[in-house]
């Protein structure tokens, strides 16, 4: 245990000494991963689905405040949505503004959690996100985490339905109804949102207590609660828990 504490202190000292160089590099890597994820899962506008565009945007984000990365990502999403249709871009923009006004403005110090959330799904480690946020951030990180889950599921929904959404013969009203249902009736998404928020609040509550092994207990409790909530939610809504984000999406294709 003493060796771990010494290693932690050395890392802190190294970081404080070279922070001016380390932070831009970390922001660049994170922005690159986030923008590549967006282009990989959307990629409808070929002009911005380009590694050189991603590199330029990531370089810009590396020298600017971290919040810029979030809004650049939003801009990419809206642009890709516009390639499918003006109604898709408009719906995406309204959804983003809704989240920014009602939720993200209260958690500005933790909003990078929104970037990490879809990446955690992309790397197939979603359980680590709420546990890590509860350990390293405050309780308000539950807001961007929940928003990140919605962004992830909505992008995956658009990916499944993009043929229908870009079809000019489909009425705009029908497309808007489809998009609305993709949010409101996506029970797999809402199960995950609730699980993320509950785990972050629980882990943060335990972690901030003064008893021994609080961190270890918080990690174990968070993992157990997450798994139980996902399984219980999947059982209640009769979803295939191994593919909870796809079961509901496929229902819209029929």
Positions of the model-derived regions?
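Hydrophobic transmembrane alpha-helices
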Residues: 20-74, 80-81, 90
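Conserved small/polar residues in nucleotide/adenosyl-binding loops
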Residues: 247-254
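Membrane-helix interface "capping/anchor" motifs
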Residues: 61-71, 102-111, 136-142, 207-217
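Generic multipass alpha-helical transmembrane bundles of integral membrane proteins
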Residues: 121, 130-239
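Membrane-helix interfacial "entry" motifs
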Residues: 12, 16, 20, 46, ...
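Membrane-interface helix-loop-helix junctions at boundaries between adjacent transmembrane segments
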Residues: 74-144
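Structural signature of hydrophobic alpha-helical transmembrane segments
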Residues: 46-48, 84-94, 189-194
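Short, Lys/Arg-rich, polar N-terminal cytosolic tail immediately upstream
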Residues: 1-16
